UniProtKB/Swiss-Prot annotation:
Keywords: Endoplasmic reticulum, ER-Golgi transport, Golgi apparatus, Membrane, Transmembrane, Transmembrane helix, Transport. This is Endoplasmic reticulum-Golgi intermediate compartment protein 3. Residues 1-25, 364-384 are cytoplasmic. The gene is ergic3. Possible role in transport between endoplasmic reticulum and Golgi. The lineage of its organism: Eukaryota, Metazoa, Chordata, Craniata, Vertebrata. Its main location: endoplasmic reticulum. Residues 47-342 are lumenal.
Amino acid sequence: MESLHRLRQFDAYPKTLEDFRVKTCGGALVTVISGLIMLILFFSELQYYLTKEIYPELFVDKSRGDKLKINIDVIFPHMPCAYLSIDAMDVAGEQQLDVEHNLFKQRLDKDKKPVTSEADRHELGKSEEHVVFDPKSLDPNRCESCYGAETDDFSCCNTCDDVREAYRRRGWAFKTPDSIEQCKREGFSQKMQEQKNEGCQVYGFLEVNKVAGNFHFAPGKSFQQSHVHVHDLQSFGLDNINMTHEIRHLSFGRDYPGLVNPLDGSSVAAMQSSMMFQYFVKIVPTVYVKVDGEVLRTNQFSVTRHEKMTNGLIGDQGLPGVFVLYELSPMMVKLTEKHRSFTHFLTGVCAIIGGVFTVAGLIDSLVYYSTRAIQKKIELGKAT
């Protein structure tokens, strides 16, 4: 009993008898408010605990031979699909001018609604080809005229594109498609006129080498001439080229939680005709490791935009269109998901309860003793 009596001396929470306790309305109000505050802060701490923590790390990118996937969804409200070509090239010298897969063009009306029920697949760098004649009716061994543009290695022009290519090799302007039988047969002029007031949506993805390069959207047929990439714009009027565009989505690789693509939802209006828009993109290779161990290899990027007026078809002034020029950072970012510490959560909850309880006690004491002091003064005033 002696030891128990000594132990009681260490009690930091002495109790008072029920008869000596005073309960007030002010104390009840403080208790209710402090309880609600504790409840709100508890759920806030719980929500914070349940969210995953991201730990960033920085490494030198040692990956080699990988491909870079470029996801594209861009709308050109004033550029018909028949006029638009998309090309990709890199510093290693690889060019993609005739890609058939993974990229689509959708014709749009003035309200940006699809003209057809489904998107047509196109080759990058080529205009649409709607065959309006029966190919079986033509001799497969035929050799049609190139209208004076024949060469030793290019003597037959059986399609409108063949004639355009022959003219291009000669350096001639392709201005009179209606006088060329192949183009008349394929309805080249009708197709161009039919889409004159339409827009175009380009969507899909490209796979390129993981080196610096660019891809661009520009009017006219693209080709190489003396190791220079050019577009045939001689059949277009520069005053008719409106490169207003809306980038609905542009990313380099797979999405991961929290990824922000800075160009998504951006819209740029061309204030003049024949504008050249350049997007300079810095790509940072990124590895995202989920809590379950799944690894996502992707990229994040930053971008700056530059625009200028072009006055020439070919030359130092540039080409009208939208150009995305990208380069890769030598550093790699690794983002690792981890669960938050339960002990940290427990510490936070204890701090919330103890802190609110202590502050509430101080407020209650202040209110109680202030009220008593005022009441005593009032009573003394009445007595005198």
